[in-house]
Amino acid sequence: MLGVFATSIAAMLLATPALAQDRVPVAGATGTITGRLTEALKETPVVGAVVRVVGQEVATQSDSSGRFTLRGVRVGIVTIEVRRLGFAPVTKGNIAVSPAKPAEVSVVLRPIDVQLDAVTVRPEAFPAQMAASTPVSTQTYDAEEVRRQPGAQEDVLRAVSIAPGVGVTSGGRNDLIVRGGAPFENLFVVDNIEVPNINHFGSQGSTGGPVSLVNIRFIESASLSAGGFGARLGDRTSSATILTLREGNRERIAGELNVAATQYGAVIEGPLGKNASFFVNVRKSYLDLLFKALGFSFIPSYEDATAKVVWRPTKRDAFSFLTIVARGSISFDNSTDSGRVTNSQVVNPGQDQYFSGLTWKRLLSRGVATTTLGRTWTRYATSQRDSLLVPVLDSRSTEGENTLRTDITWLAGRGVEIETGTIFKYASDLRYDATLAGFTRRDARGNPQPLRVDTSFTALRNGTYLQATWQAQPRLRLSVGARNDWYGFLDNAVRFSPRVSASLRVDPVTTLTLAGGRYYQAPSYIWLVGDPQNAERLKPFRADQAVAGVTRLVGSDIKVQLEVYGKRYGDYPARRFRPQAVLSPSGFDDATTDIPLGLEPLESTATGNAFGIELFAQKKFGASPFYGQLSTSLNRTRFTGINGTATRGAFDSPVTANGVLGWRPNSKWEIATRLRGATGLPFTPFVSAGSLAGTLDFTRYNTERVGTFLAADLRVDRRFIMRRTQFIAFLDLQNFTNRQNQQAPVWNPRTRMADTNPSIGLFPSIGLNLEF
């Protein structure tokens, strides 16, 4: 395999002259940039702004709708600068200009006092102020930063995992560990639709999985807030990831054919009349071919489809519709004894799912109102069999939920911004049919407690918020908010969550930030059916957070940020059969070693805390051909279960570090590398003898750690530019040093001993993308 990929690298290198050639694109190759300028908060069009391409003699002005078109732009990755009297100038980089189709961008301009010193008003690559909903601990990545991430395998969640304070559970999954919290504590919002899980083969009751179902080519921006977010975002205690998908291009019909790390697909997009656009994408995996070639006895397969339509009938109204449909399954080859033994330790997470939403955005005289009607639906077919093909776990369930939310932003005058809104969620289709063998579900004394449940119910809840932000002085910004959540399915529980934040600009390049608040989260629906009393014992759990930080700009395209944080958990789900532990599902847990999916007696009595410090530095791509970022996090996480003893959290990783360095020498080539390191996660050793051999020994809960995680990734992109077509080839080497990081040991039923569990090591992939 290594020989094949070495040959591929050589072929790419020989396809063009040396990298050190002049940084000028193919002669005569040009493209178009189209976009829209809006005013921050009000989202009204910005008319008459000058938009120019940095380093090229191409410029234009925005029209009465705030739209602009830049033609004759040399192909490659470019930066535009936007200036308008009364607004802070903005630069927007990483715009990929192609001869095949227009690059569509959106730029938000912030009003300023025209009397401010001119020397302090300069174009910057980073927002001067954070949004009230994400005042601290937030990193935003544009489309190109997400796409080109080394080792991400074109997965948006792996791409944003480089943010400070964020880790992953293992190399083969994208579950996000944010400041010591469990993956189920993370919120995901796609085009204003809250989605329980955006992954193929997603973990039921949690948020992670092996591969995202959101196509990375449609990402306009991806923001991850690691904590301290405002009152608009709720029902999660750790983080919020907000994905904004771009519109289809409005110039002409265009398409793409692509092959990526694990799938191939096609895209078509273009205008629908004068005021509308669309895109449609279908993808199918070829993992079945890879797994068969590598000799695996279990063969995963998935496919998905994405469609989005945007219609702007007037200057004040915009409608958008998004839908993503996906399905995934795993087939097993049980023709050999070794295959049956291997398959007996693999959970089959078959899933069919979709989410969709219709959004209406209306510009008001001094603000904007947004209403979204959405639905999420997933059908799970989770199963596991032992080496004799006897069922161990069989869980078939459906979770369907309808959502209606309205958000209003209003400029009240005198520097005051008001944000308010409400969200109703009605889970109209909750059905669970689960069977769990007794030997996999033992109580604290080791007695088998088999489970058989067949039930259905509905759930209604509401969250309403109000937040006021005051620009008290040109350099001081204060925000106070509150959120009230009602959970009809949890005995009509009501929870009140205050939030506060402050931002002080000490000088033109230095800003101090502070945020704090209370955050509540409802237990996952499947946890309620793990025991007849769970619905009575479980209640919303909480996290009180405080974050303080300082951010300094070192030039217009370099940012350095230092933050300290603390979290204190209460009413966290504790495990009655495992009194030492709190609930912390993290993926395809082997049902033969511990109880899966939270199908066990739980109660809201656990507590916990997490503290840490993070250092983050980022350089955007600009005049220099280099870009990169570096983050280092120190963290300590502890939880206390029913037994009253504080122990390491399941996702306690004291040291996490990420580094990315990229070089774009010309319009054809790009080379980037990523270094990742983290303290190994805790694990619980196995009982090694007796009738309980092969089960986890919770008397030694999380007393061991796997080895330090280290990985280095490399990505090389090559663009081939033709008259009306662009072809992009890339080579992505995940863990190119072939280091086999250790994961938690697995139990070998043949030897009745714990085996080491190394990761796959080097994972190379080639990607091809044809734009036409």
Regions found by a protein language model. Give the residues of each.
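Periplasm-facing N-terminal accessory domains of Gram-negative outer-membrane beta-barrel systems
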Residues: 17-127, 134, 470, 475
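Surface-exposed extracellular loop regions of Gram-negative outer-membrane beta-barrel proteins
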Residues: 194, 198-199, 329, 430-442, ...
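Transmembrane beta-barrel wall of Gram-negative outer-membrane proteins
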Residues: 260-284, 296-330, 348-375, 410-416
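Structural signature of Gram-negative outer-membrane beta-barrels, strongest in the C-terminal barrel
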Residues: 324, 399, 409-417, 423, ...
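Outer membrane beta-barrel strand-and-loop segments of large Gram-negative receptors
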Residues: 401-407, 452-458, 463, 539, ...
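Gram-negative outer-membrane beta-barrel transporters
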Residues: 473, 566-568, 594-685
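C-terminal beta-signal and adjacent terminal beta-strands/loops
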Residues: 570, 622, 677-693, 707-711, ...
